[in-house]
Amino acid sequence: MRLTPLPAFDNNYIWTLIAPDGRAIIVDPGQALPILEAHSKGLIPTAILLTHHHADHIGGVPELLERWPTLPVYAPHDTRIALNYHRIGEGDSLNILGMRFQVIHTPGHTHSHLTFIGNDLLFCGDTLFSLGCGQIFEGTPTQMLASLQRLAALPIQTRVCCGHEYTLSNAAFALHVDPTNTALQKRRQQANAMRLAGLPTLPISLESELNTNPFLRTAAPTIHAATATHLQRTPIDEVEVFATLRHWKNNFPIKNIP
């Protein structure tokens, strides 16, 4: 299976897993046009996976279903997803084109957010980003941290397929928090070169994220010290470290939406 991110909007990625015969699994098609263009080059939509209900992740589905009415769609139980789809949740598994996906519930960004894991690939929507994490629109810091910790416990060779190209803007905040992290400095340089070349910075290995993403390193002494300085007091616990980082990032001059 060939993994290909298709750019959409300003910074979204629609992830595709394409079999040798062109049949493809599509993750979070916020727009139909990139899929229709790929179809003109041989891609055959076979199934759609949706991580959450936000329009920039599901907006292209109605048009795709007009073109392929029997195309199966798998998504979380959420009344805001106004589609004919298969409702899935924590503990479910999917077998599509010979790939088995484990479904896990990762609340925080939204209440019903799902993540798909298969063949060492992690399709995490807006829960985990390269060098960052999603904003907490519906859940709590405790929920979001727990979701991130579940993902952090996966095998380090797991390749992280995020919903947005946010590496450089996230790197600016991460380096503000953790300026002496040499692995982080190197990642920023590599990401800058890739973007200048017009290349995606994703997927990224979970191992790299564990070494550089402050939202996955809330127990690290350097991150704890940075949040203590920001708060001007010692954080109560790891949840407060995380919540402080998230609030700090929300107000950082270089912002991501979401």
UniProtKB/Swiss-Prot annotation:
<dbReference type="GO" id="GO:0004416">
    <property type="term" value="F:hydroxyacylglutathione hydrolase activity"/>
</dbReference>
<feature type="binding site">
    <location>
        <position position="56"/>
    </location>
    <ligand>
        <name>Zn(2+) 2</name>
    </ligand>
</feature>
<feature type="binding site">
    <location>
        <position position="109"/>
    </location>
    <ligand>
        <name>Zn(2+) 1</name>
    </ligand>
</feature>
<dbReference type="InterPro" id="IPR036866">
    <property type="entry name" value="RibonucZ/Hydroxyglut_hydro"/>
</dbReference>
<feature type="binding site">
    <location>
        <position position="57"/>
    </location>
    <ligand>
        <name>Zn(2+) 2</name>
    </ligand>
</feature>
<keyword id="KW-0479">Metal-binding</keyword>
<dbReference type="InterPro" id="IPR017782">
    <property type="entry name" value="Hydroxyacylglutathione_Hdrlase"/>
</dbReference>
<comment type="subunit">
    <text>Monomer.</text>
</comment>
<comment type="function">
    <text>Thiolesterase that catalyzes the hydrolysis of S-D-lactoyl-glutathione to form glutathione and D-lactic acid.</text>
</comment>
<dbReference type="GO" id="GO:0019243">
    <property type="term" value="P:methylglyoxal catabolic process to D-lactate via S-lactoyl-glutathione"/>
</dbReference>
<feature type="binding site">
    <location>
        <position position="126"/>
    </location>
    <ligand>
        <name>Zn(2+) 2</name>
    </ligand>
</feature>
<dbReference type="InterPro" id="IPR035680">
    <property type="entry name" value="Clx_II_MBL"/>
</dbReference>
<feature type="binding site">
    <location>
        <position position="52"/>
    </location>
    <ligand>
        <name>Zn(2+) 1</name>
    </ligand>
</feature>
<dbReference type="Pfam" id="PF16123">
    <property type="entry name" value="HAGH_C"/>
</dbReference>
<dbReference type="Pfam" id="PF00753">
    <property type="entry name" value="Lactamase_B"/>
</dbReference>
<dbReference type="InterPro" id="IPR001279">
    <property type="entry name" value="Metallo-B-lactamas"/>
</dbReference>
<comment type="pathway">
    <text>Secondary metabolite metabolism; methylglyoxal degradation; (R)-lactate from methylglyoxal: step 2/2.</text>
</comment>
<feature type="binding site">
    <location>
        <position position="126"/>
    </location>
    <ligand>
        <name>Zn(2+) 1</name>
    </ligand>
</feature>
<dbReference type="InterPro" id="IPR032282">
    <property type="entry name" value="HAGH_C"/>
</dbReference>
<feature type="binding site">
    <location>
        <position position="164"/>
    </location>
    <ligand>
        <name>Zn(2+) 2</name>
    </ligand>
</feature>
<feature type="binding site">
    <location>
        <position position="54"/>
    </location>
    <ligand>
        <name>Zn(2+) 1</name>
    </ligand>
</feature>
<keyword id="KW-0862">Zinc</keyword>
<keyword id="KW-0378">Hydrolase</keyword>
<protein>
    <recommendedName>
        <fullName>Hydroxyacylglutathione hydrolase</fullName>
        <ecNumber>3.1.2.6</ecNumber>
    </recommendedName>
</protein>
<comment type="similarity">
    <text>Belongs to the metallo-beta-lactamase superfamily. Glyoxalase II family.</text>
</comment>
<dbReference type="GO" id="GO:0046872">
    <property type="term" value="F:metal ion binding"/>
</dbReference>
<dbReference type="InterPro" id="IPR050110">
    <property type="entry name" value="Glyoxalase_II_hydrolase"/>
</dbReference>
